[in-house]
Amino acid sequence: MPSLHVFYGGTFDPVHVGHLAIARAAHAALQAPIALIPSADPPHRPTPGSSSMDRLRMLQLAVSKEPGLSADPRELQRAARQNRSSYTVDTLTEVRSELGPKTSIIWLLGADAFVNLSNWKDWQMLPALTHLVIANRPGITLQTQLPPKMATVFNHRWVQDPATLRNTPHGHLWLLNQPPNPSSASKVRAAISAAAHWEADLTPEVAQYIRTHRLYGIHDIN
């Protein structure tokens, strides 16, 4: 069976149970290991609420007991080495160079990120580098929320059978249907700063890391 390399990019600020649910579902559906790649400070989004090293460490803790999942620090390392902004297209160009032109590569992302893909650097180049697997997210309807310029690039690329992704190196889209999880990083951060209940959205190891390192305003809690 041809090999398949799956990368799940995100800010993971912090990584929560919704992220893990998507990664587990992709691992089961695609029968391939999932490498989660935390971004450096993303140029198209606000600066993360914790440092890149904190986000990487939380991600490592979250996947440490998850078969088939791993944390890949390549994007943080490249941003630190080159002292410049981090872009997904650069990561995928690097991965494609490493794995060669015939290897099947998948970039996994949530539907909420996908509908804003046209804000990413050189987003039109992505089909030449990778397949895209889009995980459904609460409140996102791709048929109605996809900008016209994205629809022109992507609408003819959808496939129904994920086996197509393994048998071709790049260029297709597939929708990962899994039970939507309402967890979000912004909700977790807001709950922490408001001294509300937040631990249920995180693994115990990540929750303890946040307490220990006083992240997201938790030091303001009495």
Swiss-Prot record:
It holds the Pfam family CTP_transf_like. It catalyses: nicotinate beta-D-ribonucleotide + ATP + H(+) = deamido-NAD(+) + diphosphate. One of its GO terms (biological process) is NAD biosynthetic process. It is an enzyme of class 2 (transferase). InterPro entries: Cyt_trans-like, NadD/NMNAT, Rossmann-like_a/b/a_fold. Its EC number is 2.7.7.18. Pathway: Cofactor biosynthesis; NAD(+) biosynthesis; deamido-NAD(+) from nicotinate D-ribonucleotide: step 1/1. GO terms for molecular function: ATP binding; nicotinate-nucleotide adenylyltransferase activity. Keywords: ATP-binding, NAD, Nucleotide-binding, Nucleotidyltransferase, Pyridine nucleotide biosynthesis, Transferase. PANTHER family: NICOTINATE-NUCLEOTIDE ADENYLYLTRANSFERASE-RELATED, PHOSPHOPANTETHEINE ADENYLYLTRANSFERASE. Catalyzes the reversible adenylation of nicotinate mononucleotide (NaMN) to nicotinic acid adenine dinucleotide (NaAD). NCBIfam families: cyt_tran_rel, nicotinate (nicotinamide) nucleotide adenylyltransferase, PRK00071.1-1. Belongs to the NadD family. This is Probable nicotinate-nucleotide adenylyltransferase. It comes from Xylella fastidiosa (strain 9a5c).
